[in-house]
Amino acid sequence: MAGSRTYRTKVLVLDKTKLKETDLILTMLDERGRQVRAVAKGARKPGGRLAARCELFCTVDMLLAHGRSLDVVSQAELMEAPLGAAPDYETTCAASAIAEVARVCSFEDAEDPFTFAITQRALALVGSGLDTAHMDLLVACLLYTSPSPRDA
C-alpha cells in the first residue's frame, strides 16, 4: 500500500453519535473545510484517553488513520474550547445551530477553507458571552440584512 496510512489535521467537532458501548462516531470539519467522519474508540469511557478531548464545538488536533469506511482517531489533543468548560443552555443551543449549518454545508469530497474559518469564528463569538439582542444584530449583519421597524 503506497502512501501513509495516518494523517494529522486540525478539526472542529460538530456531532457525536453513539457506537457500541464505549465508542463514538465523530462528525468533524477539518481545516481545509472538508467533512470528516471517524470512530473514536473508548471515547464514551469516563477515564478514556479520548473522552475529554473530543467534546462538541471544540478545536482538536487529531491523528487519524484511514479505515475501510470511516477513519479511526489514533490521537487527539484539545486546542481550544470556545464555549468553556460548562456552557449554559442558550450558548449550547446557539453553538448547536452553528454546528448544524456547518455540517450541512460541508462535504467529504469538497474542500472549502472558508467554512472552517467562519465556523470557528462564529463559535468563538457565541462563547464570548454576547447577549441575545447583540447576537440577533450580529446575525442580521452577517446576512447583509437590517431589521425592519415592524420587527422591533
Give residue ranges: language-model regions.
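A surface-exposed, charged beta-strand/loop segment in the N-terminal or early-internal portion
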Residues: 2-117
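Single conserved hydrophobic/aromatic residue that forms the stacking wall/gate
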Residues: 144-152
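A residue-level signal for conserved active-site and pocket-lining positions in enzyme catalytic cores
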Residues: 98, 141-143
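Anionic-ligand-binding alpha/beta catalytic cores of soluble enzymes and soluble regulatory domains
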Residues: 136
